[in-house]
Amino acid sequence: MKKRTYQKAWLFVLPVVLLVAFNAVIPLMTVVNYSVQETFGDNVFFWEGVKWYEEVLNSERFHASLLRQLAFTGIILLIEVPLGVAIALAMPRRGPWVSVCLVLMALPLLIPWNVVGAMWNIFALPEIGLLGKAINGMGIDYNFTRQPVAAWFTTVLMDVWHWTSLVVLLAYAGLCSIPDAYYQAAKIDSAKPWAIFRYIQLPKMKRVLTIAILLRFMDSFMIYTEPFVLTGGGPGNSTTFLSIDLVKIALGQFDLGPAAAMSLIYFLIVLLLCWVFYTLMMRNEEQ
């Protein structure tokens, strides 16, 4: 008997689609409106065209924030992805310890971002923090509130602690989806662990690793709460990433025109980089 397909199933999700579109389109149009105007009190607006876009794109402040953002994203991806895969490979696939390991890996992801920043702010203080006292006890002058290198080290370490678990869980799900027949065939061929990883595990994990890298890229490129609570963008502007700089311009200086233009440029950069990255990953997978 031929199954009948219900062609109007989309009607059930239409309200949600309209709600999401409504919540996204109106704020976006508001930002576009501010990005081409100069605003004054009493709802007085003057048309400025692309003036704010030119100002942002030619701003050394924007260039410096963008470079810091790209450097931070590159560093944490180079650390978190290999580390997450290594931890996933070390985790048991069967037995009572599976649940224990999964719960431990999920715990950092359940902590709110502002709490993570506050925790690491206390943890890294040179006078009372466990991390700060331990590093200073080794004879290394460490103070993330005054030293840009120490602030970067602490910010990267905090992000690695908070988000490597996401890569671990996704990589572990990919490993668990590999049929046992592959491992049995490798055992018959006396394959070494490196060969098993290279020819069996890594190819089977490509799709989940693509998702993990894409998620971590987008999240790290838009990071705000943790570094802002930890360092406030300092010392100086050493940890002022694009998101922090955008908030300072919009809410600190109340320059709505440049802030709106910068937010749209920011959005387009994230969208473009994600599209390029995803296209390259999918092309490599097809090949």
Regions found by a protein language model. Give the residues of each.
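A structural signal for multi-pass alpha-helical bundles of membrane permease subunits
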Residues: R4-Q287
